[in-house]
A protein has these predicted regions:
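Short alpha-helical
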Residues: 11, 37-38, 71-72, 95, ...
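Short, solvent-exposed amphipathic alpha-helical segments in soluble enzyme
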Residues: 21-22, 81-82, 144-147
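Internal alpha-helical scaffold of NAD(P)-dependent oxidoreductase catalytic cores
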Residues: 38-45, 120-162, 171-178
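Rossmann-like NAD(P)(H) cofactor-binding subdomain of soluble oxidoreductases
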Residues: 36, 45-121
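Phosphate- and divalent-cation-binding pockets in alpha/beta enzyme and binding domains
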Residues: 15, 41, 75-76, 98-99, ...
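A structural micro-motif
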Residues: 2, 26-27, 48-49, 86-87, ...
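Hydrophobic Val/Ile/Leu positions in short beta-strands of Rossmann-like dinucleotide-binding domains
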Residues: 4-6, 66, 130
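NAD(P)+-binding Rossmann beta1-loop-alpha1 motif at the extreme N-terminus of oxidoreductases
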Residues: 2-51
Length: 178
């Protein structure tokens, strides 16, 4: 049983949160968003509390899922207490694992596919890429995500970036052509 905090209230945070809660073994104890209305809206969906202040983040969680835009990851990480004992993980395809160098336990939970919070998404068909800074961290993240997405696999930062570029081309490139 893991206690988790969702950092972000957008597409990936919403679908991960809903699927983790529906799976039933884990609890989301807090949702952070810089927009308090968005934090509260997602907190209501996942039966949690909300905050719009990273200094008020619960420091007792087992996992902190950072599901924010690539442009916001660095500022969010800079504002998190570095003493967190729990795993800190982001969901970005393009952000290296070394952004967490100041933390103890860290990893990546990467869905290589566009996810929309307003469209119910069956995450079981998405092959999530998982990366961890240690075997123990990797195994915790892998077992958590594999329970909701059986096609989950291990990947390195290099593999994830290549996968991300492929996914961007497959999902978005044709839009750019027209």
């Amino acid at each position: 049983h893991m206690k988790m905090i969702l950092i972000g209230s957008g597409n990936v945070a919403t679908q991960l949160g809903k699927n983790i809660v529906a799976q039933g073994n884990h609890q989301i104890i807090q949702v952070y968003s810089r927009n308090s209305a968005n934090a509260q809206a997602l907190a209501n969906v996942v039966n949690s509390t909300a905050t719009d202040d990273l200094t008020q983040i619960n420091t007792e969680a087992d996992l902190y899922i950072i599901a924010v835009s690539d442009s916001a990851i660095h500022s969010v990480i800079a504002d998190l207490p570095k003493s967190l004992q729990g795993i800190v993980a982001h969901t970005s395809g393009a952000t290296n694992l070394d952004v967490f160098a100041d933390f103890i336990n860290f990893g990546v939970i990467y869905p290589p596919q566009s996810i929309n919070k307003s469209i119910e998404t069956n995450l079981s068909v998405i092959p999530f890429g998982i990366e961890g800074n240690s075997t123990q961290t990797f195994e915790k993240l892998f077992s958590l995500i594999q329970a909701i997405a059986p096609k989950t696999f291990a990947c390195t930062s290099q593999q994830r970036l290549a996968l991300h570029l492929s996914a961007v081309i497959a999902n978005n490139f044709s839009n750019a052509l027209f």
